[in-house]
């Protein structure tokens, strides 16, 4: 899977859950399915269409309408519904219930966008969570992150093999994002609300042109360069 833009990151379980690791086993009937959560949402602005996303993925050319819609999407989607859970958690040692909570939160965002384009919702599966764990552990154990030149393909392949997936097809499983370092959060500790806020921003980035920059740069068209992640999620 070609990746033109690297998103912010220090790898964590939450980061893996925000991308392809959630979806890799989506059609595997051998995994257990839980209810889909539809709490948090992202609104797709007018001009953000399925045909525009397909066209970019086929030609690499974005229409002005798609770029403008992506700008609007980044600026107007500001309510993450992350709540006020200020309990600190170690992102490298999340409990299973915390992983499930973050997974379902992420799925609610992705599904809100899919549904607006007439696509079916994805559902949470334990097998996908196990795969996400294995991918995240490969990054963590081998001191890799999204700051590297590309995805950690050998680790992803090992995780795929351990999960009973095809490990010979290369990097087709992961869309990655992660956690920035800030003055408030500069260790592995985050609040659950902070994690959800970051996942919300990361999913917005993936949907809206791979936006890279600060709030003051959201009107800069040059900051919107790829919709491959959007094609993966949608």
Specify the residue positions occupied by each region the protein language model found.
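A well-ordered secondary-structure block
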Residues: 38-56, 158-234
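Generic detector of short, well-ordered, non-transmembrane alpha-helical segments enriched
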Residues: 35, 110, 128, 221-222
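Gram-positive Sec-dependent secretion signals
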Residues: 1-40
């Amino acid at each position: 899977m070609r990746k033109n833009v690297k998103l912010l990151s220090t790898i964590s379980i939450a980061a893996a859950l925000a991308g392809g690791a959630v979806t890799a086993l989506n059609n595997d009937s051998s995994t257990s399915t839980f209810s889909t959560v539809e709490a948090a949402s992202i609104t797709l602005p007018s001009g953000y269409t399925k045909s525009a996303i397909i066209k970019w993925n086929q030609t690499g050319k974005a229409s002005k309408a798609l770029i403008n819609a992506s700008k609007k999407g980044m600026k107007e989607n500001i309510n993450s519904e992350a709540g006020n859970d200020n309990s600190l958690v170690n992102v490298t040692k999340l409990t299973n219930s915390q992983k499930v909570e973050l997974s379902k939160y992420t799925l609610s965002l992705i599904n809100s966008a899919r549904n607006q384009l007439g696509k079916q919702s994805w559902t949470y599966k334990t097998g996908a969570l196990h795969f996400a764990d294995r991918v995240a552990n490969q990054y963590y154990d081998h001191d890799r992150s999204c700051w590297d030149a590309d995805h950690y393909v050998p680790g992803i392949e090992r995780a795929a093999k351990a999960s009973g997936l095809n490990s010979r097809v290369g990097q087709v499983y992961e869309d990655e994002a992660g956690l920035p370092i800030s003055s408030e959060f500069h260790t592995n500790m985050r609040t659950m609300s902070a994690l959800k806020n970051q996942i919300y921003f990361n999913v917005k980035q993936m949907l809206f042109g791979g936006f890279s920059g600060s709030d003051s740069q959201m009107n800069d068209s040059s900051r919107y360069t790829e919709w491959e992640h959007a094609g993966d999620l949608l």
